Amino acid sequence: MNEQPSSYIFPFLWLHGEDEATLRKYVRVIHDSCLNAFCVESRPHPAFVGPQWWHDMDIILEEARSLGMQLWILDDSHFPTGYAAGAMVNAPAELCRQSLVCQAIDCPASGEWLELSLADYAKAQPAQLSMMEQYTLDADHLRTWDDDQLISLVAVKEHGTGEQDLVDLNEALGQETLRFQVPEGKWKLHILHLTRNRGPHRDYINMMSAASCRRLIDAVYEPHWAHYQSYFGSTIAGFFSDEPELGNGHLYESGKAIWQMEDHAWSAGVTKALREAFGAEWSKYLPLLWEQPFDSDLCARVRLTYMDAVTHLVEQNFSEQVGDWCRAHGVKYIGHVIEDNNQHSRTGSSLGHYFRALGGQDMAGIDDIGGQVLPQGEWNGPWSVSGEVR
């Protein structure tokens, strides 16, 4: 308002490998618009954290410093944050994303025997791409793994009223055949696998794994420190994460309740948390992440325990680890997750818990690019910016 440069608003400066004169002009135009800061948008650049990137950043930083400006750095080469500049493309399996999937089979009538060849269920069912994924993903080049694990066999009674209506059949694991005499009532056999062959971004970090998230720091943050240590905390204000995700489910689907998800985000930390919560038979409760209808109190307990584990792991291993690194190096950490349609409280394209997802950041934020937040409050109409019912 007084024509003095401000840092309250800072635009994104999209970089495509422009020449030096253009880069200097862009920085000056931002400054002359009474804006004292900007965020370097790395994703369209042809050589992020490569020689041309450092060449272009040298120019931008020199110009920004001469004008007394600050800049933030968007922290990845692909959208969303988590690609780690390609560091996960050939990463060991244990660092990659993993999902829990469930296949349910109707049991025969009460008193009859269910016999199942477990060799037919050694692997999870193949993933089915959504229409959006068929158009936007190169399905022939999606990374695939052969380390599927059959982890649990559980019989679940329809309209069950408690733990007595969950039958742990894991003693059959490792055997050729499962034999189960069906008790009174209507039952389903739930076959649960861990698989890495799910999700649209299989070459992204696992947000629940400290070692996996460290790949992002090593690939992006550390090289910037190595090149520009003298700018940290002065011209370089910090780093920006854009819409990091857990990545299970389908590409940018929204509005699904937990029991409607085709797969659930997983890590070794989730296994540990559920074992601590439910004991040695923890895996017999896994069908209740999906099963409808069943005792609502027990379903709620299982789902809350799962989501609590997932989101605490995200906070600790991703958000706080990155934020702690930034503060230890004299800069700040900011960004946002997908919030539309309450997605901030879900997995898939977001991180399951708004405050834990941003717990390591110095300033929390939201995306307001489609008019979904207005001066009088949130838009209460029936549609989101993507045309989906809210």
Task: For each feature predicted by the language model, list its residue ranges.
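Hydrophobic targeting/anchoring helices
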Residues: 44, 80-84, 91, 317, ...
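Conserved short loop/turn motifs at secondary-structure junctions
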Residues: 41-54, 307-312, 339-343, 371
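Acidic/glycine-enriched edge-of-secondary-structure segments
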Residues: 9-16, 205-209, 365-373
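Hydrophobic alpha-helical scaffolding
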Residues: 47-50, 203-210, 214, 308-312, ...
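Mature extracytoplasmic enzyme cores
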Residues: 1-2, 8, 22-32, 50-304, ...
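Active-site beta-loop-alpha junctions enriched in small/polar residues
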Residues: 16-18, 43-45, 76-78, 241-246, ...
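Catalytic domains of carbohydrate-active enzymes, especially glycoside hydrolases
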Residues: 21-43, 59-63, 70-72, 325, ...
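Hydrophobic faces of well-ordered beta-strands that scaffold small-molecule active sites
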Residues: 9-13, 38-40, 71-74, 237, ...
